[in-house]
Amino acid sequence: MFHLRTCAAKLRPLTASQTVKTFSQNRPAAARTFQQIRCYSAPVAAEPFLSGTSSNYVEEMYCAWLENPKSVHKSWDIFFRNTNAGAPPGTAYQSPLPLSRGSLAAVAHAQSLVEAQPNVDKLVEDHLAVQSLIRAYQIRGHHVAQLDPLGILDADLDSSVPADIISSTDKLGFYGLDESDLDKVFHLPTTTFIGGQESALPLREIIRRLEMAYCQHIGVEFMFINDLEQCQWIRQKFETPGIMQFTNEEKRTLLARLVRSTRFEEFLQRKWSSEKRFGLEGCEVLIPALKTIIDKSSENGVDYVIMGMPHRGRLNVLANVIRKELEQIFCQFDSKLEAADEGSGDVKYHLGMYHRRINRVTDRNITLSLVANPSHLEAADPVVMGKTKAEQFYCGDTEGKKVMSILLHGDAAFAGQGIVYETFHLSDLPSYTTHGTVHVVVNNQIGFTTDPRMARSSPYPTDVARVVNAPIFHVNSDDPEAVMYVCKVAAEWRSTFHKDVVVDLVCYRRNGHNEMDEPMFTQPLMYKQIRKQKPVLQKYAELLVSQGVVNQPEYEEEISKYDKICEEAFARSKDEKILHIKHWLDSPWPGFFTLDGQPRSMSCPSTGLTEDILTHIGNVASSVPVENFTIHGGLSRILKTRGEMVKNRTVDWALAEYMAFGSLLKEGIHIRLSGQDVERGTFSHRHHVLHDQNVDKRTCIPMNHLWPNQAPYTVCNSSLSEYGVLGFELGFAMASPNALVLWEAQFGDFHNTAQCIIDQFICPGQAKWVRQNGIVLLLPHGMEGMGPEHSSARPERFLQMCNDDPDVLPDLKEANFDINQLYDCNWVVVNCSTPGNFFHVLRRQILLPFRKPLIIFTPKSLLRHPEARSSFDEMLPGTHFQRVIPEDGPAAQNPENVKRLLFCTGKVYYDLTRERKARDMVGQVAITRIEQLSPFPFDLLLKEVQKYPSAELAWCQEEHKNQGYYDYVKPRLRTTISRAKPVWYAGRDPAAAPATGNKKTHLTELQRLLDTAFDLDIFKNFS
């Protein structure tokens, strides 16, 4: 860590030509012009002080002189008057030379202005020293701010920065100043606001004001921001004398909020002392901090705030910020109550909430949503961002003025979790920005038992925010008024600039990680200090009593009033008989379900379309709907091929997707497709965004030109992130059931970078939080000799997490069996072998009366496979998604002659049919495709097995035996046939890697599995 004083040597003050655009201290911008000063435009070698940073300072002086010549030193007045009179470079502070031959009058005039030979160099150096001093405070002052309420550590972990960085003579000497200069008056640059209405101050007062602005209980990190207007805005907020003032009414409100925050935790501790609740003790100021951000944002027009936070203090936020009924919170502590809703539920400090109420400060309606989250710290960050983006989209809030997000973090997780970085880098991307998030870090200076010095390599836990130029406000949480001021500024920053901002609440944790944990094992000295520490409520109450803002009886009455509220709610909680998880829903869908949360029907209409619609979409997909738009020659051939397919009434994979999307847009369903390179498609098959070859950045999205009143289509290339982007899209899909939200992995192999979102949100989300989600994952999958990282979407992992029982045969005679299966499952897993079926499953996702995540293993080689085509006939009215595609060749005509029935899924079907034809076994081997793997199509497969009574059964897959679908399909297929026959395996041997990287080995393995599949004697020895 550099010392504050050493940084000044590297400073380069901002030039006046830059500052003219922004804040000046009550100086008219119109007067600030530099056209007449010759030292600004002429070569500067002749003026020894007009070089480097000196020239910048001279411009500052010139600005001041233009407004008021008496505001600068007399020597400067002479210099500028001489220069304006036309003195050549190098002579403005001496007797001026003749301007031209014969111009004696001009010479006489210029010479009369020179009254003295000032020591200009010394004067400039002194003023530059003061300017460097001011800038040093602005850059490094936060390092010596009094941030730690315990007084143990500097919040930035750097104990080597001396607290008396300026006041001693040797420190002043670094700047070329000494104690004799302390009472000298110096003109202030336009890059500071410490002067208020004054343009010059004594050095002693300059230092005092800088200390007050930057070295007390607030530390401001902002000088890395590369926007001058934003820097000036922040300087004005923190440097202006007396700006941090609160009315008595505001102080009383702050005290009341602290009472609620503190007494809530104390009440829980009294009633349930042995329960984990991850209390807020040590950072009780978080509650008034959040309420201040919400109040200020509401005042600025925000009417919907979406929040995400970890477990620490969550119950307090639910109770005192979102205003969840206290009895509902207290019920969660009753171990005797049973859950009324299906699913596992979740612990109380993970639950979300949605509530609409009146903001009492602004008297405006505001909706607050706290997103449910797992214990995986920071995982909810992109989810909150995605939900915020969706809510902004649906209400037409293109600038983020109505809907905003607040994210809470712990210090250790904020520094340690990579998803924080991924989320920050979404913050300013056009298709992902939420126009500014307020981040609040509960910096209790410990991560469970880990010291901050072992938890991060950076000075602050917030340093990650610097990558997006977000200002960072560090504040001592034991100074509630400083916290409130910082939160007001943060809300104003977001409202003004629509960019991220970070509030770092430097606090402590009074108890262990949870209430049952003993922190003295690992932090004995820290906790000895904490035991002595007065609670912030007591400190602030004593301060207000001493100021006469409140008296002791009023304070005690506030406490007793809230205690009574808690006791009454506790009594009501005893009347509750069951726990309702649905009371904790964070994203309700009004009107989609019945009042009791059930689907309005248990059926799905046909997903087919009329030929007119198919043809119209196909024609648009094969053309450029914009005039004077030049596309690439290769793309012209692709569009021509599409047009020929439409004429022939067939579709390939890309065209089937186009038709599914286009038809849903016609029905008012917004579609959002996101992922790496999805606009073109990793395999150059999609081309949903056309690029003009002659005009840079000119693009066209034909999908948005289909129908007059269609829903908008959003297709957006994402950043190179899986975890963050999938979380974002999951959050987007939470907001409304009437949108098809898809995330496509570049290759299915890369989805495991987002495994946390899949495991903690998508798979169990409904079971834990009674929250449905219709997100679609497109995962390119197929063994094609491309190596172990470009072959497998790991279907075995998705199938292993399906919630059906492989050993129980459901009631196949149940009405709407297939729809009931879908309703009961936790997600749907499909592997389509035809474009038509892909078309149907996308449309079914929206036409179902409920929402489930959809996992689709999409093809790669089939995108251009000549046999992977579907006729319009497969997509017309009356057609549906086929869960199973049965054999329809000669084997199906004479089923009694079939020796083997092969079950498979996906691309391997085309390898099998080719091999079967080559071996002339089309009548002996039947091939049935399972298109929907989960929920398992027991009913249809039973019919297939019964159709071929003499056939032995085998499962064929191109994946290795310990991967793919075999371990999922075999027990369910055995259950289907009551274990009457064995189910043999034809496929690759077990392996650690998903695929070989050697092409020859790949082909050898493929031929071996085909030999196994069609050798009718191979399983006889195992019988």
Swiss-Prot record:
Source taxon at top rank: Eukaryota
Positions contributing to Mg(2+) binding: 411, 444, 446
GO BP annotations listed: 2-oxoglutarate metabolic process; generation of precursor metabolites and energy; glycolytic process; succinyl-CoA metabolic process; tricarboxylic acid cycle
Chain sites annotated for binding Ca(2+): 143, 156, 158
GO CC annotation terms, alphabetical: mitochondrial matrix; mitochondrial membrane; mitochondrion; nucleus; oxoglutarate dehydrogenase complex
Keyword Hydrolase: no
Enzyme Commission identifier(s): 1.2.4.2
Modified residues (N6-succinyllysine): 74, 564
Residues holding thiamine diphosphate: 312, 411, 444, 446, 676
Modified residues (Phosphoserine): 100
Chief localisation class: mitochondrion
Record entry for activity regulation: Calcium ions and ADP stimulate, whereas ATP and NADH reduce catalytic activity.
Residue ranges of the TM segments: none
Subcellular location: Mitochondrion; Nucleus
Family: Belongs to the alpha-ketoglutarate dehydrogenase family.
Misc. comment: The mitochondrial 2-oxoglutarate and 2-oxoadipate dehydrogenase complexes (OGDHC and OADHC, respectively) share their E2 (DLST) and E3 (dihydrolipoyl dehydrogenase or DLD) components, but the E1 component is specific to each complex (E1o and E1a (DHTK1), respectively).
Protein's name according to its UniProt entry: 2-oxoglutarate dehydrogenase complex component E1
Taxonomic lineage from the root: Eukaryota, Metazoa, Chordata, Craniata, Vertebrata
Gene that this polypeptide is encoded by: OGDH
